[in-house]
Each structure stands twice: as structure tokens, then as C-alpha cells.
Amino acid sequence: MKKYLFFLLVLFCVELNSQQKNDISNLSGHTLKNAVRFNFIPVGMPRNFDPDLKPTMGLLGVHYQIPINNWLYGGVGMHAAITGDQGGLFTLGAELGISKKIIRKWFLDANFHFGGGGGYRYLVNDGAFLNANIGIKYQHKKYAFGVQFSHLNFYTGEIKSDAVSLFLEIPSVFRFADYKNAQKEFTLNNQDEDNFWKKPSTKNAQQVRFDFFKPIGNSKKDNVNNQAPLTETLYVLGFEYQKYISEKSFLFIHTDAIYKGLRAGFMDLFFGAGSNIHQSKSVNLFTKLAVGAAGGRVAPEGGFMIYPSIGIDLKLTNSFAISLHSGYYRAIAGDLEAYTGGFGLKYFSNTGGTETTLNKEYKTQGIHIQLQNQTYLDVQKTDSDNVDLQLIGLRFNYDLNNTFYLIGETGFAYKGESGGYAHGIVGLGISSPAFLDEKLKAHLEFAGGAAGGAGVDTEEGIVIRPTLGLSYQLANNFSLYASGGKMISPSGNLNTTNINVGLSFGLATLRGKN
């Protein structure tokens, strides 16, 4: 074992010392004018199937849309129930759409979205759903909004609805280089020279969180537990992304999944804004306010939540900090209520430009974004015979160097009578040097996190997943990825063989060296 650790350490050190610095004016880049879209769909519920259901579920969606050409776009999106009695229903999917100018600032906008997810399984069955939308969009310089006719169909379940939906779209600019230029160092030799990267940089932060929810008030468990009082402390694993819009203010998105306290199945998704009320070289004091959705394993509620919090960042370096935080977690139209506290590891960076940083030295950060189909064979369940599961998965790989990378991934079931099952995992990967005409790489990965829902036997939710895989470069930044391994729950009976196949897009972001 010591020999293996020594070998890995040598690889890491070799990578750190093999960097050559280049002039930043020689680094070619690309600009994507993306959009973040929020939409709201009032979904009619199947009361002929279950008369006790509330008539309408309000579904909030957030979508990240990327232009393919001047009229076609693709992207990924999530939905969450925020009104009605389906709190805890979440989805993940991929989409393809068109936006075609009609006249002046008015556009025809239509898209098709496929994904997986769910809440109460008897209403969604496998979890697969289709969402088709068509309507008009008004394009302003700083935002867009529109109205659409929407068809939502959990086609193996009972939820099928036509409705008029609304959306708000916020533009976003993203600058990046080809992945072949990742993990290289650059110098800014002439600050006055005009080049592609002489643009404002974006400050952002990413955080892995470990939180504890202490339920209070009239918080209750789900119907399976006869809505007994919820008194157990909930242990949750979360991830948060922050984008600064000024020196002190930021927007953020944040999600959690339970791994202890209740049987797995509880999760949340929040959007919000925050401000650093005090900043120094060693400490940030901050306040945040978020709204979003939460549910699963608690009494049926609408799902809409509010979450104010305060905290402190204790800076270890210019890039890393230990973050401590506490808050108040409250359902807007329900009983779920809790005090929260926790800690996290936060990473700060300035990316995408050189104009607003004091840096003279820069480095390109390699990132892979993958959309996967994941298969889990002979999955153990608590309420039925073993089944084969199909999941739609979204993952991000962040290169530490040319060999090691960090992993963040989520997946939602769409086939296997387990709608509502999902996982969120993080981990470490090792990739080999490229071979066979420098197109093929081997990958060894170890990840763990929280998973559960729909009777999949993960007990309280902790899972680990070792895998071995291959990637093959198709063209420029695109590659095929395939892997196989095991998904195991240490506290439950889950022990399943896992096969993953997906398409990966690689890129390199420019960040200032601290």
C-alpha cells in the first residue's frame, strides 16, 4: 500500500513541476452567450386516480441553455415542486430547443425536454417524463421573458398535464479555451495589449457542505410513518456554487441530500443572494437569503421553502477557506421547520479574463462536463423484487493536474419502477496518459455520497462507487466515456453492478494564480 501511495505522490509532484509558462496573448478562446432560464408550470394532478390529491402542483424549473447556432440551443435542467402536495418531487433532464426571430424583439421559442425524477412513486412509476413547450419570447438586452403552452407527461405513471407556463431568462457570458490547452501556465507580459482574454474576470466560489438540520415546531414524518413528529437530527451532504455580481455581493445555487437521520429520500434545491458584510485577508462574514424547494420522507406539503443564514469563511489560503454557517429552514405553506448548522470547504477563483484582476500569472483549469446513461443491475429494494435501474446522470470533472481530477455527479432514475430515486456523489479520479494515437485514456475513480428514494435499499443513504473506465476523443473537445463498477451501501443492502455510457465535453477556463 505504501508503494502505491508513494507512486501517486511522485506522479502529483512531477505534474506540478512540469509546467511551462506561455504568453497569454497566444491562448485562443471561445465565447458562449448562454442563458439561465427559470420557468413555472402549473401541473394538473390526476384526481380521478386519487381524489385526495390537491388539484394543481406548481413546478419550478431552472435550465442552463447553450447555443448550438444562431437559432438552435441545447441544455440541461431541473424541476422541483413548490405548490400543491408534492413537495419532494425533483427531476433532472436534457433539452433541445429553437429560438427564431419573428419581428423586432419577439421570438418563437420551442423546446423538448426528457428526463427522470419523481416524488411519490405511485404517481410517476419509472420516473421518465417528457416536457414539450412552445410559445413566444420577448428579448430585452439584460433579460428575456415569455409564455408557452406546456405538455408534461410522466408517461409510465399518472401525471399528464397541459398548461400555460411562464419563464424568465437571464443571459450569461462564458469564455473558455480548448481542453488541449488545460493545465498550462501563462503570463500577462503586456497589460495594455489587446487580446481575447482582456475582459472582466468573474469571481466565483464552489463549496462542499456538511450540514445538520434540527427539526422544530410541527415538523412531521411522511404518511408511511403516520406523520409522526419529526425530531431526529438530519445529516445532509450539499454542494453550492456562488457567482459574484460585485465585490461583496453574490448569487448562488445550492442543493442537499440526506445521508443520516431518516431513510434516504429527502433533498432540497435553493437559489438565492448573499453579501459579505465584512471582508479581510483572513475572514469573510456573510449573510444569505435563499428560496427553493425541499421534501421527501416528510409530511406531504407544497415544497416551497425559505432559508436565511449567516456564516463566516476562515481563509486557509487565497483560494481555500473553511466555511461555518447556521440558519433557519422554513416551509412557506407547510409545517417543515428546522434550525441548521454546518461547515464546508470552499474554493474561490477568478476566471474568464484578465481585466479586473491584479494577477500577472494565470493557469488554465481543465473541466469535463458529461451527460450519461447509467445502468444499475439487480438493484436491491425494500418493497419489491430486485430491479434493473436506468438513470440520467450529469457530472463534472475538475482537473487537479493532468493525472488527478475531482468528481461531482448527480443522477435520477427514469426506468425501473423507481421514480424518485436519485444520488449525489463526489470523488477522486485518476486518468492515464493518452494512447492509441493519443485518443484513448483509462480512468480509475472512487466516489461516495448520498443516494436513496423509491424503496432502493440504501437505508439512510450513504453509498460508495468505485469504477474503471475508458474515454475516447471523438473531435476537438468531445469524447465518448464508458465505465463499469459497483455501487454499494455500507448501511443498507444495496450492492449492484454499475455501467455508465456518456458524451463528454472538455474545456479549459482561465484563472488567476494566487
Task: List PLM regions with ranges.
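Repeated loop/turn-to-beta-strand initiation elements of outer-membrane beta-barrel proteins
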Residues: 70-75, 104-108, 138-147, 174-179, ...
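Residues that define the transmembrane beta-barrel architecture of outer-membrane proteins
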Residues: 54-60, 86-92, 126-132, 160-164, ...
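Outer-membrane beta-barrel "beta-signal"
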Residues: 40, 160-192, 209-217, 337-376, ...
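Bacterial Sec-dependent N-terminal signal peptides
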Residues: 1-24
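Transmembrane beta-strands of outer-membrane beta-barrel pores
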Residues: 40-46, 78-84, 98, 114-120, ...
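Surface-exposed strand-loop-strand hairpins of Gram-negative outer-membrane beta-barrel proteins
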Residues: 42-62, 76-77, 213-240, 376-395
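Transmembrane beta-strand segments of Gram-negative outer membrane beta-barrel proteins
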Residues: 26-44, 74, 110, 198-218, ...
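Residues on the lipid-exposed face of transmembrane beta-strands in outer-membrane beta-barrel proteins
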Residues: 62-66, 94-100, 134-138, 166-170, ...
